Amino acid sequence: MGRPRRRGRDINGVLLLDKPLGLSSNDVLQKVKRLFSANRAGHTGALDPLATGMLPICLGEATKFSQFLLDSDKRYRVVARLGQRTNTSHAEGALISEREDICHTGTDDAALDSHRGSSQQVPSMYSALKHQGKPLYEYARQGIEVDREARSITVYELLFIRWEGNDLELEIHCSKGTYIRTIIDDLGELLGCGAHVSYLRRLQVATYPSDRMVTLEQLTAIVETAQAEERSPNAELDALLLPMDSAVLNFPEVNLLPTVAAYVKQGQPVHVAGAPGEGMVRITEGEERNFIGIGTIAEDGALHRNAWL
């Protein structure tokens, strides 16, 4: 018989991890889960191994609300290496073409403008999107091209930062599902020289502040120091977590009396005076305004529960 599976802690909250270079999002997720001894953990939108930056990790009950972060806007800083196009649109891909005739007359506002606003984007074959249960990148590595549907994306802001030599640096604020590598590949073709991503960092997810990010090194140091001093690291680790409702603070709040909240918890719709006319809401209970879940205001004005603690 195998050893019994150890149950983790019932710890709930959101950790803003500064994902390091070279590790997959799942790699760092598992490391964080072990360091916190958490029973459940999930990330909220993968970053490539070659990307760094903000990766919100939901622990425990917070995993119920991770979808709302998956659906949120993102902000990135990216450096495009002009003159070289690769099959993956990043630095570790195979070189497809190389051109020396790189235009240095300016930022080419027309090329940048063409990527601002709403558009349709075809995901890269070297992406984690799944086709028949298998990631697209697995097909690509076998030389198989799969038809992909274009998806609606929005680039809210595309800022020119600098252009030095063959490096063009941009900051991009975009909607969910936007592939920065695809934007850079398309931009390189519009500039007539080809391009790939040489550096990518996620600066922000939703409205989370970048100064609350922590690194794996910081987490590991906390655990190792506690072990050396023969004490628990849990209190110090838990202090780094943001509350569960931080994932849904963009939704308007509906505060319920405990007696009314009891009906909603049982799955019964209720009408609440002063609630928004429709849409998703963040539900709190009592004078303490304890977060208890997410609900939807239907067309008839009734509050229905969605994700619940």
Curated annotation (Swiss-Prot):
Provide the top EC class.
Answer: isomerase
Catalytic residues as annotated in Swiss-Prot or TrEMBL: D48
State a single Pfam family of this protein.
Answer: TruB_N
Listed A to Z, the keywords are: Isomerase, tRNA processing
Task: Report the SUPFAM superfamilies cross-referenced here.
Answer: Pseudouridine synthase (SSF55120), PUA domain-like (SSF88697)
- Does the keyword Transcription regulation belong to this entry? no
Top-level lineage group: Bacteria
Q: Which residues bind substrate?
A: H43, Y76, Y179, L200
Q: Which InterPro entries match?
A: PsdUridine_synth_cat_dom_sf, PsdUridine_synth_N, PUA-like_sf, PUA_sf, tRNA_psdUridine_synth_TruB, tRNA_sdUridine_synth_fam1_C, TruB_C
Q: Which residues form a coiled coil?
A: none
Mention one GO biological process in which this protein takes part, according to its record.
Answer: mRNA pseudouridine synthesis
Q: Which NCBIfam families match?
A: TruB
Name assigned to this protein: tRNA pseudouridine synthase B
Please report the organism this UniProt entry assigns to the protein: Yersinia enterocolitica
Q: What is the lineage of its organism?
A: Bacteria, Pseudomonadati, Pseudomonadota, Gammaproteobacteria, Enterobacterales
